[in-house]
Amino acid sequence: MAKFYYSDRRLACWAAGKNPHLGGSIESWLAAIKSDSSFRQTVKEDVQVNRLQPTAVRMFSWKVGSGPIDNPEKCNWHYVLTGEVPAQPTEPVKAREVVVPPVKVIPSPPPVPRPYFRPVGAFAPTRSGFIRATVERLSRKREESRAAALFAELPLEYPQGAPLVVPRGFAAMRWTYHATWRRWYDASDERALRVHPGGPALPPPPPPPPIQKPPSFEERLQAALERQSCARAFALETSLGLNMAWLGTAAIPSTSVCCADGRTTGGQTIAQEADPINHRVTSNTAPGRAQWISERRSALRRREQANSLQSLAAQTDMTFEQARNAYLGAADMVEQGLPLLPPLRNAYAPRGLWRGPSTRANYTLDFRLNGIPTGQNTLEILYNPVADEEMDEYRDRGMSAVVIDALEIAINPFGMPGNPTDLTVVATYGHERNMERAFIGSSSTFLGNGLARAIFFPGLQYSQEEPRRESIIRLYVASTNATVDADSILAAISVGTLRQHIGSLHNRTVASSVHAAQVQGTTLRATMMGNAVVVSPEGSLVTGTPEANVQIGSGSSMRMVGPLAWENVEEPGQTFTIRNRSRSMRVDRNADVGVALPRMSTTTRGLAGRGSVQVPKDCQAGRYLKTLDLRDMVSGFSGIQYEKWITAGLVMPDFKVVIRYPANAFTGITWVMSFDAYNRITSSITTTASPAYTLSVPHWLLHHKNGTTSCDIDYGELCGHAMWFNATTFESPKLHFTCLTGNNKELAADWEFVVELYAEFEAAKTFLGRPNFVYSADAFNGSFKFLTIPPLEYDLSTTSAYKSVSLLLGQTLIDGTHKVYNYNNTLLSYYLGIGGVVKGRVHICSPCTYGIVLRVVSEWNGVTNNWNQLFKYPGCYIGEDGNFEIEIRSPYHRTPLRLLDAQAASAFTSTLNFYAISGPIAPSGETAKMPVVVQIDEIALPDLSVPSFPNDYFLWVDFSAFTVDAEEYVIGSRFFDISSTTSTVHLGDNPFAHMIACHGLHHGILDLKLMWDLEGEFGKSSGGVTITKLCGDKATGMDGASRVCALQNMGCETELYIGNFAGANPNSALSLYSRWLAIKLDKARSMKMLRILCKPRGNFEFYGRTCFRV
């Protein structure tokens, strides 16, 4: 595999090529990579993931300075994309050039002038198109008045199928003007040729008018005045070159996306529009076509809104129509470009003695943004939506409260079209300290996209006395990439409200549409537990959605203290982040360190339970600390999540476990939190916690030097089934806390850390979760979860030390005299050997006063004693992140996954050897060893050998040494350990049995094969074997199919359904209503041995990852 050489320019070219939809030049990507180290690391990791792509090899396999794209002036993109290298010419370019004498071309005579009567197409000529085409000709002759008089007589458009009638005055014009018809006539209709087959001939004269009474003087005078006014109007239009244009705005459908941590506690976004740079759009189409375009645009907008709302409705219990009503309350006003706030007559019903609504909606906030604040300089504006005069007026009428039914934010930017500067406005309730609860809504846009509006229906109600504090609505304005001058006015931001004043004896008179939007918004807010719905216009001049980072409460803060008076306020802030596309909203409550708590992106997190773990001051390796029961944590806390659990009954949550402890880099302690879903290891770790148990179940490392740590538990995947609120079914979920590496420095006293459990309990739709493993012949894809090697300890007194990690990953773990089956070892035991590239990570668990330089290589048959040879081996140094990637070295290209009993691991297998080429070092007086923990994440490009038992039967159990003739064995609908008091039982040892042992539940169909041997002569044996399928129990159950096999048959076959009424069964004998199998022997002592083999049929599923001690 070629070595990659990285540079900022190469990474910028890679990022630009992978994200063509974001646009931007190579220099802009290069500036982003140089200024953001985390972004550079993200791009580098993406290159490493796709290092096998030809384009990646051509870009990064050259040394820096000699690559095809290193020189900005001579980038060979053709080679990067195609791999073609231009060959050197073998002869002069003109060696084979053939000189052809030029051919003299005789010009053709000019074409005969065509008649000016051109056919009329499907769309007849319009007045505006005809005027524009003719003004160019008449402007040269200064005949505006004559043209206006002629054109005024033309109809607006001709009906389809009607003959074309042209005035005589126009037909008498000169032949040079006939080309103007091409600008407004289509050649797809033959009506004109049918009317005038001879070419430029005058149309037939109109028939003489019928004889009638001559008009009176008044009628003739009125007709003359009308003709004169019409001629003047059209003369003015033609002289100025005006057109009656159709004016409209482009409606951009709003995109409503939930935040990454699933929190929303504010109002809901109803609609948003964008008018790109307020262009006037001139339409030369007929009115029928303009109407068709408008209807088509509306249909596309409704379809995009439906797709966005359909996904939102699918996440909640609301119907699609309910979600649409909550989010599109004022969407019908977007197309006209009007404000989104509905008129008062549409929002409120009249009330009072004189039928007058006590509402006001004219007091708005309008301010000019002079320089966009970026970074920590977030602009904060405290705004009171109700004037003091208005409050005094309605207070005298007996009103005691104000209700903000709707709030609109409008951003009208100034500057160049297409400017990618982003701008975000966040609206919150000013009297709420919790940001998530105070959130009303947010609007983000690019300044180059023009006017953008958003409307929210918060339903905010507050007292008449509160507005005097001048802080009802807080607005936060920020940008992430502003590049314009600081003293320029960039945008006008307006905030309008729709409100009403109510009293103790007054009912709210909000219209049904507004009320429905508020009710659905409240329901949505309660369902999603506060997800911030953020909108942003898309599809305008600047594509995509902005990425905002608003420091709430920090930087420049202004408070309105009067009509034209403001004051500055400084407050410690929080962070409001909007990621492009994902539209996440994160709130930073940890103001001390300034880092937001890690959150999941799929569920809303609410505190469900808590517990504490006591830590001794001298916490040594292998120390057992405490076990916390997840069910007891939730029920003991008795919070709102427990009430939801009782209501839902059956839940399958995603837990977020936050372990809060102070960071200390001098102790060197590393704890392990093990998730034991089926209570398999509790009895094995009460005295000493061996890593053979704590690292065999799903686990997480807690480093004391890192401080507070969080981890996610997908209960449906790790446990395998849902949990009932007041009793256990198959599970007994525990969190075990043990010490993996002990402390070097004893602390002053015993202490404890806090464990918080966050979850959102929603009713589960099924009992079983996702299967952890599905049996098939090629189930392994190279990736691991929770594969951690016990600590490697380096002695401080040795030099040139090394530690080896054996790659016998399919070997069963041994703890003293006990075998421990876990999932990773069992998974690899399905194969004889494996090769590939090992990817993993090294955790340095020592105190910060220790130091070491590690180099990892892969070796076969032990380690090398020649260090010069060592540095010739392929290897890598362990950096700060601890990641490593090394190919397995073996003379067989694979390493065995298990060994024979007499073989040693160091003599016949590949190992990962971690050489301390420098160190370990520590201050004087330190004697403790330096612990290092290795985690293996993946074996990339796995080179698997043949399976251990490809598509074959596994041995389940052998019965022998029968002591009675009438023997009966009950085989329940589960694969479990069978015992007997009247015969000797020997259980089979195979990968399938191990996989059953290290899972909580299993489900599928087994093909059973029964074989036996006889004691006496073959022909003299009598008796038989009866196999009966039953359901339920013997007393009240039901009998199914049955078959009898004579002993002389020496065997028979049947099948066994694994599962119960719930879907799956554990590997222990549990009395649940299910199918089972009875095997009866009437002459058991005539048999020497009874053997039962099994083979999984189809997709055999395993649920709930755990381990098992034999």
Swiss-Prot record:
Entries under InterPro entries matching the protein: Nepo_coat, Nepo_coat_C, Nepo_coat_N, Nepovirus_subgr_A_2A, Viral_coat
Gene3D superfamilies cross-referenced by the UniProt entry: 2.60.120.20
Q: Which GO terms describe its molecular function?
A: structural molecule activity
Q: Which UniProt keywords apply?
A: Capsid protein, Host cell junction, Transport, Viral movement protein, Virion
- Post-translation changes: Specific enzymatic cleavages in vivo by the P1 encoded 3C-like protease yield mature proteins.
Query: Superkingdom of the source?
Result: Viruses
Q: Name one GO cellular component term.
A: host cell plasmodesma
Q: Where is the composition biased (Pro residues)?
A: 200-213
Task: Please list the GO biological process terms of this entry.
Answer: transport of virus in host, cell to cell
One Pfam family in the UniProt entry: Nepo_coat
**The UniProt record lists the keyword Aminoacyl-tRNA synthetase:** no
Q: Where is this region: Disordered?
A: 195-215
Other noteworthy facts: Virions are comprised of 60 copies of the coat protein.
Give the protein family: Belongs to the nepoviruses RNA2 polyprotein family.
Q: State the protein's name.
A: RNA2 polyprotein
Q: Which organism is it from?
A: Arabis mosaic virus (isolate NW)
